[in-house]
Amino acid sequence: MTVGDETAIFDFGNQMPKDIHETLEIVYSSLEEKGYNPINQIVGYLMSGDPAYIPRLNDARNLIKRHERDEIIEELVHAYLKK
């Protein structure tokens, strides 16, 4: 085989994307820790898509950006309406 014919391997290690519920718990607690109103900040992010609403503390900003906003909203509506 010549150089360039080999398949490159990318390893995520142990950093698999967290599920939406776990991500929201981390984001919520990070916002509380920073002294912000978590609900207002999360709604601001979901409506605008601006990650500045979410702090970098505990990697919250990077975690929430791993999920599509519409998927987060879908999960929230599902959890709210679940009986």
UniProtKB/Swiss-Prot annotation:
Coiled coil: none annotated. InterPro entries: IreB. It comes from the Bacteria. Disulfide bonds: none annotated. PANTHER family: UPF0297 PROTEIN YRZL. Belongs to the UPF0297 family. This is UPF0297 protein LEUM_0557.
